[in-house]
Amino acid sequence: MNNHVSPVDLSDHEPTVEERMAGVSDTTRSALVSTMLTPRFYTTDFEEMDKINVEPVRAEWDVLIAQMKSDPNRGHFKRNEQWDDIDIEGLPDDLREEFIDFLVSSLTSEFSGCVLYKEMKRRGKNQEICELFGYMSRDESRHAGFINDALKEFGIGVNMGFLAKAKKYTFFKPKFIYYATYLSEKIGYARYITIFRHLEKHPEQRFHPIFKWFREWCNDEFSHGEAFSLIIRSDKRLMEGMNRYWIKFFLLAVFATMYVRDHMRPAFHKGLGVDIDDYDMKVFRLTSEISRQCFPLVLDLDNPALHEGFRRMERINRKVMAADAKGGISGRIAKGFWSAAAAVNFVRMYVIPTKSNAIPATSRLQPVW
């Protein structure tokens, strides 16, 4: 059974982080790691978020909130006869390792949203925004719990209560939360639906039953993105002036992170029967198409220089990982050098011209892909 998780259930006195680290699982330790490529936990200026005024998007807002309130996916995140038994030890070693990494990363991302949205609801005073975050926290809680149930089946569940306390939190201004979370939700939809559609055509490559749940799952991600689109559109300043440069930054950062991270899981994608480059470009194009609802620009995904930038970033990341594994003074020097090279490459990618987009009169889209 899928148990929802709530970060506010963690208020009772418990042992310190140091006392508990000795007993945590490898998957929990993995979820605790914070790097440029791993999902992070965020906090923000909640008083600033209380100033959100949804009146400019009132009609679409009310429809979306009514949809979320109806909870169309209630009952979906429960196992049924479609959940096949699987012997994870029967998977090839590299596939098993990368699949577990995928699950832990996905759980961390979902739980990050759960924690952030729950905190927004708890600390906010804007009732309309608090209502929204309550629904989104509910959904992310289900997602994280469902993934953790799959991990627990193999005896490698993540201690999410411990994770909420021990994970480092990154402060983002509200507008950065809007841009980053909007993209996270929409690219999450694009990733999940692309995998789901592929496995519909090739069910023999579905090596775990959790993929059968991806369609309704990604519809939650889609509706969360719709909410952040409306928040962005509620204040024209978030789509104009210097904020255009921030939008470009987050588009590039999110896409580059996905590209590099996916190439760190070759066995996982081979197991699904997908080519990583083809898959990533499908996801990028779908995410770009969707993001036209609220972003005044999109990356030029047809520019060969951008593709080469992604490939170069992936090669540099391998150098960074090798230097980190080497350790010692020489390893630290090499890691610093290649990290600087990654920053230079990002700047080179950033100056590649984008394509302008005229924001449509209305925002709402439907998950029809």
Residue ranges and their predicted role:
Residues 2-369:
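Non-heme di-metal
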